Swiss-Prot record:
This is Phosphonates import ATP-binding protein PhnC. The complex is composed of two ATP-binding proteins (PhnC), two transmembrane proteins (PhnE) and a solute-binding protein (PhnD). Part of the ABC transporter complex PhnCDE involved in phosphonates import. Responsible for energy coupling to the transport system. The gene is phnC. Belongs to the ABC transporter superfamily. Phosphonates importer (TC 3.A.1.9.1) family.
Length: 262
């Protein structure tokens, strides 16, 4: 099976606090993987390293590859980082959309990387690009909102627009950082249904950080659980049982209680 993401010996330190400890991870083509763990476990930090939004410590042997290209090595970004980012869609908890633009215009932003610079300065997009943007909106059930200002949408609708933008980008990998954290249960279900649909039908690799274990079990075939910057579990979601859940979360609660008592 083709390896899409490869992480070797990744470490990250913030202000003398080590957030990640020599993490090794391989993610394969068309997998849908959940990164789980309590707050501060390192899951979002790990995700942000995958596309080079942040760099790791200058550790000997640390290396991240995405789509066969080096993203960073020993704490330094690759010179051609834009080439690996070109086919990587990033979905944020806070949507990262331009509120003053329409839904369609926000989706067309996904085409900027493949559009000549002089046309991007004037937002001149071709008829074919606009048609692809409408098709992406159709995929996520948002085509009827194409000409509506994005600021008028609900959180769940905005998140689906962000997914459509990733489709417009022709992403081969989607990295979703807490995409349903601020959504109501129905909106969260629709967003996760949408991610699973494009994973299964388009073969797009999806890596998603989640706090909600039930969504990870329902939607993701594989779980990578982090605890205090270490990979605690990496395997099938079917094997992530109550005992592992308790060990992952209760031990953290016990540490916090002891710290307060001290």
């Amino acid at each position: 099976m083709q390896t899409i993401i490869r992480v070797e010996k990744l470490a990250k330190t913030f202000n003398q606090h080590q957030a990640l400890h020599a993490v090794d991870l391989n993610i394969h083509h068309s997998e849908m993987v959940a990164l789980l763990g309590p707050s501060g476990s390192g899951k979002s930090t790990l995700l942000r390293h995958l596309s080079g939004l942040i760099t790791g410590d200058k550790s000997a042997g640390s290396h991240i590859e995405l789509l066969g290209r080096t993203v960073q090595r020993e704490g330094r970004l690759a010179r051609d980082i834009r080439k690996s980012r070109a086919h990587t869609g990033y979905i944020f908890q806070q949507f990262n959309l331009v509120n003053r633009l329409s839904v369609l215009e926000n989706v067309l932003i996904g085409a900027l990387g493949s559009t000549p610079f002089w046309r991007t300065c004037f937002s001149w997009f071709t008829r074919e690009q606009k048609q692809r943007a409408l098709q992406a909106l159709t995929r996520v059930g948002m085509v009827h909102f194409a000409h509506q200002r994005v600021s008028t949408l609900s959180g769940g609708q905005q998140q689906r627009v962000a997914i459509a933008r990733a489709l417009m980008q022709q992403a081969k990998v989607i990295l979703a950082d807490e995409p349903i954290a601020s959504l109501d249960p129905e909106s969260a279900r629709i967003v996760m249904d949408t991610l699973r649909d494009i994973n299964q039908n388009d073969g797009i690799t999806v890596v998603v950080t989640l706090h909600q274990v039930d969504y990870a079990l329902r939607y993701c075939e594989r779980i990578v659980a982090l605890r205090q910057g270490h990979v605690f579990y990496d395997g099938s979601s079917q094997q992530f049982d109550n005992e592992r859940f308790d060990h992952l979360y209760r031990s953290i609660n016990r540490i916090e209680e002891n710290a307060k008592a001290a």
